[in-house]
């Protein structure tokens, strides 16, 4: 069955994703996202979008870097040749 994924960045803990409009204390870490990516490898992911990045709320830039890593991981999942 085809899967379209909307990934909300406020799922991450504010310690690694402060640049979101609705931070979630006690949120998840990168390793948790990596585990989801591993599960998705065996499913039919046909598209994805990433939401809730607000770079103005993060003067360190770490949120934009993490968002780019998430997008890269999802693109790699969508690339059936990889």
Model feature map: region roles:
Residues 1-82:
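Catalytic cores of soluble, metal-dependent hydrolases
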